[in-house]
Regions:
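Mixed-charge, low-complexity intrinsically disordered regions
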Residues: 278-295
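Acidic catalytic motifs of isoprenoid enzymes
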Residues: 1-183, 190, 194-241, 245-257, ...
């Protein structure tokens, strides 16, 4: 899940960029409160985005003030105060990281050492937020079961991850949750799974690992897929998700920070999709540029 949901920073207002960074620090502090300091190493902007939009949907304003922390011990910076929603998001972040490394170990990749860093934090999540741990565990188990069927359906392949985010939104939003919020987070979760699968196309092809895009289209590489006629189908899949996100947003009321939420959802996700479809990674580094640089 990690690394794909980002703001389109050149189009952020200064106030929104300040808020975005402050909420990133807030989630970091939330992780430390619930799971301990070592668990902060798994912090991602993906969960920061969830903090932005879920505080908004719950109608809860975020209090920000200058503070010091372990990382910024000399110079203070703007940080969001930690509330119960932030703590829940910190628990979600830690559970996701722990299970990610568990999955890496099962796939034969290195991950045991890294997982140890999050073991104590994960145990705290299980004790204090068992519902969050259950949501993550059961949906990831369903994801594993689906992938073992070797389905070539993109919808079926992404369903468990999409449901995981939708289930968490129901839990975190409480009485503010409704069909439109569930549809929104389902579409976001589906996008995350599919953009990750597309990004991993070449790696999975080389390893012989499961990837729905490989089974559905059979191209030799990600770039070969995008350059072919089938590339238009892939683009259509993502455009359909963007439509679903816009449709869900049109039915929701945002009390605070609408500009930041819209930037991430309506500009950030399409930007990241374009980046991956052009052959670059999530950070915008392209293989072709790397090769040219070596020459």
């Amino acid at each position: 899940m990690f690394g794909y949901v980002r703001a389109d920073t050149p189009y952020l207002y200064i106030k929104d960029e300040t808020l975005y960074r402050a909420m990133y620090c807030g989630v970091c502090k939330g992780i430390a409160q619930v799971c301990g300091h070592t668990a902060r190493m798994g912090l991602s902007y993906d969960v920061t985005f969830l903090s932005v939009i879920m505080h908004n949907l719950r109608g809860e304003d975020v209090k920000i003030e200058k503070q010091h922390c372990f990382t910024h011990c000399i110079r203070s910076r703007q940080m969001a105060e930690v509330d119960e929603l932030t703590r829940r998001l910190g628990a979600l972040n830690t559970a996701l990281v722990y299970y990610k490394y568990t999955d890496d170990i099962m796939d034969g990749d290195r991950g045991r050492g890294k997982r140890l860093w999050f073991k104590k934090g994960f145990q705290r999540v299980k004790k204090k937020y068992p519902e969050i741990e259950r949501i993550v565990r059961e949906n990831l188990a369903e994801q594993e079961k689906t992938e073992k069927t070797k389905t070539d359906s993109l919808d079926r392949a992404a369903d468990a991850t999409a449901n995981m985010l939708a289930d968490f939104s129901d839990y975190a939003l409480e009485d503010k949750a409704n069909a439109h919020t569930r549809n929104l987070f389902y579409a976001i979760g589906k996008w995350i799974y599919l953009i990750d699968a597309l990004d991993d196309y070449d790696k999975d092809k080389k390893k012989g690992a499961y990837n729905p895009f490989i089974l559905a289209y059979g191209a030799e590489s990600r770039q070969a897929l995008i350059a072919s006629e089938k590339g238009k189908e892939v683009e259509y899949v993502f455009n359909t998700l963007f439509f679903d996100i816009r449709e869900s947003l049109s039915h929701l009321e945002f009390r605070y920070n609408r500009d930041l939420s819209d930037n991430i959802l309506l500009r950030g996700l399409p930007m990241m999709t374009k980046r991956i479809m052009c052959g670059c990674n999530a950070n915008g580094v392209c293989k072709t540029k790397k090769k040219n640089a070596k020459k």
